[in-house]
Amino acid sequence: MRPLFLIGLPGVGKSTIGRLVAERVELTFVDTDLFVESRYHASISSMVACCGIDKFRKRERAALLELLQAEDTLIATGGGLPIWEDNMDRMLANGLVVYLRSPLDLLAERLYTVRATRPAVAEKTHSEVRDYLESISEKREPYYSRAQVVVPIGHLRSAEEEREAAEQVIEAIRHHMEKEDA
């Protein structure tokens, strides 16, 4: 099976939902952020601080090019990966791209709660987190909207809600594959 890619804004649940989906349908799970950190023995924030965002994006792209060859793998991408160079084209050509989409207010609430673990929003107020998400959403939406599958994601406040979201993703993927086979 060709790779599945989960894309979406920060905080939408790509890693959380991705792990659950991969476990449920017996796929290997890869988070590109963790993959890049492991490969370069540094956190993303330290890579960006040291070498700049362009250098990080090049490393992220190299990881993507390697992962495009993966079989039976679900890949949760970094939020910005699809908009760099021709990454989205490559994902669409080599796998199934699933866009996890949530309302910005919901994402702002979620990100604000965990902001200490997210360098891009660590020092921001709730309002600034919302503004940040709106700004990056405007840039990324034209890329994200090209995904073959779009799944609306609601609250993820409990393990049960996370499992329900994972089931929604699985059903959306199944539905898409059935249409492709028809």
Predicted regions, residues:
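P-loop (Walker A) phosphate-binding loop of NTP-binding proteins
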Residues: 9
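A glycine- and Lys/Arg-enriched "phosphate-lid" helix/loop adjacent to the NTP-binding pocket
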Residues: 94-141
